[in-house]
């Protein structure tokens, strides 16, 4: 009777507990859908240079990485980013402020990239686009971001 239930499958041992398989959008397509502009590239580039100098001791400013452990609400995250950006600007002579944006799993939640709708639907393509757009929007404020990636796929997007 077990074999009768599995006749529709090419190999009755493959994917026994898989409900659906959906393709992952290629990173090139996502980058095209949410392009970063020159302002974003300037923020990233100048911050990398400043951080490199700070690590080498050529810049005496203190590096501060601050932000939410788990980001799931873009509107609230942008509100925090705007306030932090203003504060970072006023303290830029003494501090290099980088906003932490945690989009990976936290506690029992899969994270923004894997569960952008907060309902267990696992819409990874939507999450990747939403996460990329959020990072772009924060960088457009002139506020650099730091992310902790827990897989080898997410950084490509």
Regions inferred by a protein language model and the residue ranges of each:
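Short, Lys/Arg-enriched N-terminal segments with co-localized hydrophobic residues
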Residues: 1-8
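Active-site-facing alpha/beta catalytic cores
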Residues: 8-14, 81-82, 87-89, 93-157
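N- or domain-start disorder-to-order transition segments that initiate the globular core
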Residues: 10, 15-58
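Catalytic cores of large soluble enzymes that bind and process phosphate-bearing ligands
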Residues: 36-43, 72-76, 122-130
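Generic N-terminal targeting/processing segments that precede catalytic cores or assembly contacts
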Residues: 43-61, 76-90, 97
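Conserved, mostly hydrophobic/aromatic
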Residues: 67
